Amino acid sequence: MKKFICETKNLSKKYKDFYALKNVNLTIPKGEIYGLVGENGAGKTTLIRLLTGLNFKSEGEIILFGHTDNLQYERAKIGCTIEMPALYKDMTASQNLEVQRIQRGIPNKECIADTLELIGLSNAGKKRVANFSLGMKQRLALGVALLGEPEFLILDEPVNGLDPTGIIELRELLKKLVKEREVTILISSHILSELHQLATCYGFLHKGELLKQISAEELNEECKRHICLRTDNIQKTTLLLEQKGNINNYSVYPDNSIRIFECLDNVRMISKLLSSNGVIIDEISVQGENLETYFENLIGGRKNV
């Protein structure tokens, strides 16, 4: 049975007559990297602020580490970066972390050097944050979130300002945290191609509503290139595919479509096979999506809602 680090039940945030979030039912399993996908204004940051206690919910329930009571205590196990966190510009990276360590009552002074090494700022020396690049500031913000070895890490747009090398380093660091420290991560980003290389499960937000949750394996299966086939007789179609077309790598979906994952260059052969045996074809086309296209198609029917 899966253990959930974070859950919400019908969570809503309302401003007068406007719902920034509406009836969000979120589940984040332990040890996963949960990619939160959504357009600007979809409610990603609002959701994160509710989870971390920086804003109050209007309705619904938040469950952290299996508990609904004393959430302030449970939130002590969370490290987070929301938008661009406040850093002391006249201080060094080490001094910034030391201030945060003292404020949080973390006794282990050695965690400063360990954290600087982890985020790649151990050589920053006496350089003040005011002179940091945006990427260096992002890494320092991540270091602040990692102080105290949190069990649940929440990152809002963490790759902003990072160059390609920095993005790769961050990706490997987050994977390392999951593998070696068993940290669970919620990460929101508008760079969907990067999420696709990192997340193990996804939630899709649109206009404050959570449209869908899906595992990376399920998403990859749905995005995989295939022949989408719809006919007037599924049973007869599958028999013909197997017995006369020698096609066995296919799946039948609840919407009565058939996805064929082989013979992608032989659409004409499949069409001829079915038509010549009295099957009426309603649709036959080669399809396949990346994460951006998948999300666009997912929200396509909701844009005018």
Where are these regions (language model features)?
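ABC-family P-loop ATPase nucleotide-binding domain
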Residues: 1-12, 301-305
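ABC transporter nucleotide-binding domains
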Residues: 3-6, 13-187, 192-206, 210-212
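Short, flexible turn/loop "capping" segments at secondary-structure junctions
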Residues: 53, 219-222, 250-252
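Short loop/helix-cap segments at secondary-structure boundaries that form the rim of catalytic
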Residues: 73, 220-221, 241
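Phosphate/oxyanion-binding loops and surfaces in catalytic or ligand/nucleic-acid-binding neighborhoods
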Residues: 103, 298-302
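Conserved beta-strand-loop-alpha-helix hinge in the C-terminal portion
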Residues: 209-232
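Short, charged/small-residue-rich alpha-helical element at the C-terminal edge
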Residues: 225-298
